[in-house]
């Protein structure tokens, strides 16, 4: 499914909660009142976006004619929490740009997405613009693909702990690894990449 803006995600969560509590969908006025949207025109705009992105279906002739696509299946809406470079070290951008709903079976402990920038991981089928699902954890095993902070800057690489050093290895033969020798820098694992999601425009 396509990504949601924070406001669209808020509308969708309200629809899900209302359906769970009452067993039927809210009216547009219910949505407007709960989310403090002035008038039903603003609500209609959000519902149109949710329908276009495949999250809901609407029956124009029914004031409560809203149904959730896949309602009853278990899904989770996770934040897209910023950008991480698959390339040279750069500061991470921690700014929620939207949300993406995925089936809970795909979570694998993932808590948030980061949008990948760069092409250093192309041979691991991780492309520029992909969404990497991150499971927060402070440690990693050799060959894990991780988001790591090196002296305060973030990168997405394959992790290797070797004698006297840590190697953050790209999956692109044209790129050089990042080597951090003991005592020469600080490496912190943000989390492990447990899934890659690609949205089509």
From Swiss-Prot:
List the active site: 120, 157
Q: Which domain of life is it from?
A: Bacteria
Record's Pfam families?
LexA_DNA_bind (PF01726), Peptidase_S24 (PF00717)
The record's Gene3D superfamilies line, in alphabetical order, gives: Umud Fragment, subunit A, Winged helix-like DNA-binding domain superfamily/Winged helix DNA-binding domain
Q: Which InterPro entries match?
A: LexA, LexA-like, LexA/Signal_pep-like_sf, LexA_DNA-bd_dom, LexA_repressor, Peptidase_S24_LexA, Peptidase_S24_S26A/B/C, WH-like_DNA-bd_sf
Annotated disulfide bonds = none
Task: Tell me which EC number(s) this protein carries.
Answer: 3.4.21.88
> To which species is this protein native?
Geobacter metallireducens (strain ATCC 53774 / DSM 7210 / GS-15)
Q: What is this protein called?
A: LexA repressor
DNA-binding region location: 28-48
Q: Its biological function?
A: Represses a number of genes involved in the response to DNA damage (SOS response), including recA and lexA. In the presence of single-stranded DNA, RecA interacts with LexA causing an autocatalytic cleavage which disrupts the DNA-binding part of LexA, leading to derepression of the SOS regulon and eventually DNA repair.
Query: Which example biological process does GO assign this protein?
Result: SOS response
């Amino acid at each position: 499914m396509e990504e949601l803006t924070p406001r669209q995600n808020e509308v969708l969560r309200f629809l899900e909660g209302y359906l769970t509590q009452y067993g039927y969908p809210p009216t547009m006025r219910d949505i407007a009142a709960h989310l403090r949207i002035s008038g039903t025109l603003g609500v209609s705009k959000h519902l149109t976006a949710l329908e276009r992105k495949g999250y809901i279906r609407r029956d124009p002739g029914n004031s409560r004619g809203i149904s959730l696509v896949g309602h009853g299946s278990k899904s989770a809406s996770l934040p897209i929490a910023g950008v991480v470079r698959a390339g040279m070290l750069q500061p991470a951008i921690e700014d929620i740009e939207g949300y993406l709903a995925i089936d809970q079976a795909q979570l694998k402990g993932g808590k948030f997405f980061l949008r990948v920038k760069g092409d250093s991981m192309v041979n691991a089928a991780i492309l520029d613009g992909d969404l990497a699902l991150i499971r927060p954890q402070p440690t990693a095993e050799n060959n894990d693909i991780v988001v790591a902070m090196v002296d305060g800057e973030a990168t997405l690489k394959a992790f290797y702990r070797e004698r006297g050093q840590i190697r953050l290895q790209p999956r692109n033969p044209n790129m050089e690894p990042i080597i951090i020798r003991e005592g020469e820098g600080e490496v912190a694992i943000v989390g492990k990449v447990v899934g890659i999601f690609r949205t089509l425009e």
